[in-house]
Amino acid sequence: TGESYDTGDFVRILDRVGAEGDAAGFAARRASSAARGMLRGMGLGLYVESILGDPSEAAEVTFEADGTVTLAVGTQSNGQGHETVYTRFLAANTGIAPERIRILQGDSDRIPKGGGTGGSRSVTVQTNATLSTVSAMVAAFTPFVAAETGTADVRFEEGVFRAPGSNLGLSLIEAAEMARAAGRADLLRHRTEARLPGRSYPNGAHLVEVEIDPETGRTRIERYTVVDDFGTLVAPELVMGQVHGGVVQGIGQVMAEAIVHDAEGQILTGSLMDYAIPRADDVPFIRFFSEPVPSVRNPLGMKGCGEAGTVGALGAVANAVRDALATAGAGPIETPFTPERIWRALRDARAG
């Protein structure tokens, strides 16, 4: 494809997940499970993914008459917490109080071009566009502030316009109020489009241990450890939430989820009454660790994280179940690894 990985320390990721997941102690835990008549397996899943889609986005910042600020973006959150990230990012780079910032998403009247949300791209690409808009905004306001205050060598530092040797200390909100009073509507709305020079590649490792009851085929995930390299993290708590949700989705796909039809083609899993998804007691405690190697393909060093939990979970959980079955001479079997399929595989192995 002509693409190349931006950055990564894959050996460090592998070493860290083995240490945090206590891979060295697995043999003892497997023996303990066997003493109770259980089958225990360990699975490792290594992944590298790419932020996909158009690596460009637009961002528009508008200073409203009521003293608030609207950041219009081309992406659209559907539960990831983009509003929190975008607000926090704009506040950190402008000094504008977060409570004054409103996020407007996916409005094509304001942002004609937007790549939307998908492929772990939103925060990485959108914050790059926002940073570009902030830079353009500061560049436009600086000569205006200098002219209005009669001050030379105006600089924007830590959210405030300052000038050496003067007591100038003007926030962007105050500068916007001055611009409004002066009839400078051109300074009240700023929009730029920014394009990343290349894609970033999130990567990581999942280490999983499962225990199977051979009498029932029931599988429990006993240990789950994740080490990810997402580059620079803007909102670590949201990253952890996305990883947890992605892991659960991966567990569901491997262990339970399937579309079932009858002989006439009628779907039998048409609602959540029949379509199996993980419940709270199916989900283990997920230990998450970050080993960031900042990307060199965007100013903030971010790599994206949206789909990483699922991508890593699929192989790791499947490998753990197959490892456990192999101790009894069973498998491999196809997903989903339902209790019935696992029980049949073990029965067939015993029958020889």
Report the location of each language-model feature.
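Cofactor-binding beta-sheet edge motifs in enzyme active sites
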Residues: 1-12, 19, 24-352
